[in-house]
Amino acid sequence: MSQYFENDKTLQDKPQILSFQINGKSYRLHSNSGVFSKDKLDTGTRILLETVLKEEDRPSSMLDLGCGIGPVGIVCQREWNAQVTMIDINEKAVELAKKNIVENHVQANI
């Protein structure tokens, strides 16, 4: 059984769209088999985002280490207009994150 942090090229593609709202803004992310939380925005990520977005101090830059398909970096870039750098070991997740950056009209280095 593959883990999301492995680059398992034998997995069958099952592309899908994840839709969610944070801070009253809508997001759509491309997802696929072989990535973390491929079916939905996981509870931990939702709680993390809702918590950090309440902070008054907004960072001018951030590193999204283990970005997956990009929900944290994308939401934080849109909310904070911060310089965002995203990185992940999973090649499929990185390709999806690149697509999600473009489709959510944010700027990030990945």
Question: Model-flagged regions — what are they?
Answer:
Residues M1-G24, S33-K38:
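N-terminal auxiliary segments of SAM/dcSAM-dependent transferases
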Residues I22, N32, D42, D64-G68:
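Short glycine/serine/threonine-biased micro-segments
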Residues Y27-L29:
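Short, isolated positions in well-ordered beta-strands
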Residues N32-V52:
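Conserved SAM-binding loop and adjacent beta-strand
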Residues T45, L49-I110:
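Conserved SAM/SAH cofactor-binding pocket of Class I
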